[in-house]
Amino acid sequence: MTSIELLSPLIHDKFRFSTCCSTSSLLYLHASSFFRDRSFGFRQNPNRFVSNSSIQLPQSVPGSINQERFNLWQGFSRKKSTSSSRTIVNCQEGDQKASSSEGEGKTNKDKGRKQGKNELWWSKGKKWQWKPIIQAQEIGVMLLQLGIVMFVVRLLRPGIPLPGSEPRTQTTFMSVPYSDFLSKVNNDEVQKVEVDGFHVLFKLKDDGNLQESETSSSSIKLSESSETMLRSVAPTKRVVYSTTRPRDIKTPYEKMLENNVEFGSPDKRSGGFFNSGLIVLFYIAVLAGLLHRFPVNFSQSTTGQLRTRKSGGPGGGKVSGDGETITFADVAGVDEAKEELEEIVEFLKNPDRYVRLGARPPRGVLLVGLPGTGKTLLAKAVAGESDVPFISCSASEFVELYVGMGASRVRDLFARAKKEAPSIIFIDEIDAVAKSRDGKFRMVSNDEREQTLNQLLTEMDGFDSSSAVIVLGATNRADVLDPALRRPGRFDRVVTVESPDKVGRESILKVHVSKKELPLGDDVNLASIASMTTGFTGADLANLVNEAALLAGRKSKMTVDKIDFIHAVERSIAGIEKKTARLKGSEKAVVARHEAGHAVVGTAVASLLSGQSRVEKLSILPRSGGALGFTYIPPTHEDRYLLFIDELHGRLVTLLGGRAAEEVVYSGRISTGALDDIRRATDMAYKAVAEYGLNEKIGPVSVATLSAGGIDDSGGSPWGRDQGHLVDLVQREVTNLLQSALDVALTVVRANPDVLEGLGAQLEDEEKVEGEELQKWLNRVVPSEELAVFIKGKQTALLPAQASSS
């Protein structure tokens, strides 16, 4: 249950914004970072693998042992390529591709050989140098190729085991004629036979004793050299004979059954097509995981080459992800900030106009503003308007687990910008790496962040004066930035991107309506909608237009009417009305009187203060934001930048009007419905006493600054002091102010009992009252004398009890 007033922001919000001390949530841009190149060379000598210790026998011997030799060789060499002509760079691509900062953009062959990836790890001067030999992507390629080789080998030679198969006793394969196999079967010398089509493998019964095998095998006569080789391996290996069955001869299964010979097909568990396929799939999965973690753009001629595009050129330099080009015509409501950046773009396009007058471009421009005000949109407009390379990065991409990686990326980033000068570097959310190093905003020291910041400071102050490289930084926390980064020479300009005023909001609405080609109804006036949206940022207005279009489409309308925009504003402020959750019984009656109390007190305040808006709508339909009721007071038609003391007192009384109505109607039996009202009133009263200096006892003192011990050059407090007695005094004054506001609200409610009860009953029945029906009741409201005294600032002697106590 809340009372929501769309009045202009309070003065303290404006002051905090102007000093860039807002701690609002951050606005993140999907950007990227550069990753430092590492050139490498990889040459692997051929490795020879003799499967199962095959033995080379003379070809003249009929039973010569078949030799199995496999030569595996892997080599990787990559060629350098020149940088492309397109010039919008996303640093995340650079991070994922790891391009060489020293080798890019060189078309000369001699220069291209330097730091090349096809070099060995030693230099031409025969001096050993350590360089990374292999990268994650190439490990995956090696695994994939190795898996393919093993798969092909297993298909060709099914007897060879693959990695992951069951361990086997080392075996020596000997090839013999098929006639010898038949002879051994007939002589009952065969123990086991494995038949795989025309290929037959068999083992003799005396395989355990090599000497016996040699003497009993009459049909297999080996030379002396072969016998010597067999004796050297026989104690640890078994002998398996292989042969090939002719097509017109059958396998002697009857004789093998008669001799109790164990026969069957080969054991496929150690290989076979299925297991080989699983192994290959495993290697492919490993490669896919590596490529997902370290993506590679195969469309480029070089793996580490940064993808570039010409901004604003014929190639369609488009920054946004959907391919849409952003220009300054798409930016509205921030004319001052746009003018500053247009001057920078003009300098890059026509530098002679400024150079002949002795002017130099600003080294850096820092964009500061609340989230949603358009800092990133301005940077995109610069990329779309400028005809120079535009490199965008997020500051968080510079920070890595390993110390030194961030500084390396900063060096690569600025090295590329210098090569392509004139160019622009945009670093979004720069406070991620540029926080103050004095420990005030860092509870724990971080060497990686400090080294990255030091490298950033060095690069920004080390530009050649003739190279037009401009750095754009964006942040909504300028108060935490290191002073060394904000000084002239690094960030020469600090551009504040503020929330738009009424004219700016109208311009923003026109831009979004025209871009979406939104069909508007005849009753839509964008100027009036801009008046209803005081305090909205550019992002809020863009969302408002989209919500209005969605609401119109939900009702199958052909145009977007004014009522759609009004409902969209209400959704943005109070949330979405719940369709199923409805208040019933006593709760519904309490909420109706509560909202009627806000309306009665707010109308009484508006009658005493000129230029104040009146209540236009009451609702007791629960909303998604948790509010059970809704009182809508539109903002004034003109933007307000100051809040006077009488207006502040009037807001306090209006906020506590709902609680006062509950006390009067239900004779002190109050509910918890005033939770949000009390929070907002307490915050407003505390700032009036402790920050605005609107209390006579405290005086014009900033309690926070006094308690902290002053403000240093960076805008923070150097040390803190215990000011317990001052805090107690502030708490007492805040309590007195809130109690006085509640007492005044009670007097207003008691002065208008008929209006309170009649309006509350109608709201309870209809759940929503607005327009002429609401104004009929509110026109009968009469302000009390105590309200007039309180609004004028005469806080003392409001009630007899307070007068006697004072």
UniProtKB/Swiss-Prot annotation:
It is an enzyme of class 3 (hydrolase). The active site is at E595. GO terms for cellular component: chloroplast; chloroplast envelope; chloroplast thylakoid membrane; plastid. Its cofactor is Zn(2+). Residues 84-116 are annotated as: Disordered. Its main location: plastid. It holds the Pfam family AAA. Its EC number is 3.4.24.-. One of its GO terms (molecular function) is ATP-dependent peptidase activity. Induction: By high light. Residues 1-62 form a transit peptide. ATP binds at G369, L370, P371, G372, T373, G374, K375, T376. The keyword Plastid applies. GO terms for biological process: proteolysis. It comes from the Eukaryota. The keyword NAD does not apply. It is a multi-pass membrane protein. The chain crosses the membrane at residues 133-153, 271-291. NCBIfam families: FtsH_fam (TIGR01241). In the N-terminal section; belongs to the AAA ATPase family. In the C-terminal section; belongs to the peptidase M41 family. Probable ATP-dependent zinc metallopeptidase. This is ATP-dependent zinc metalloprotease FTSH 9, chloroplastic. It comes from Arabidopsis thaliana (Mouse-ear cress). The lineage of its organism: Eukaryota, Viridiplantae, Streptophyta, Embryophyta, Tracheophyta. The gene is FTSH9.
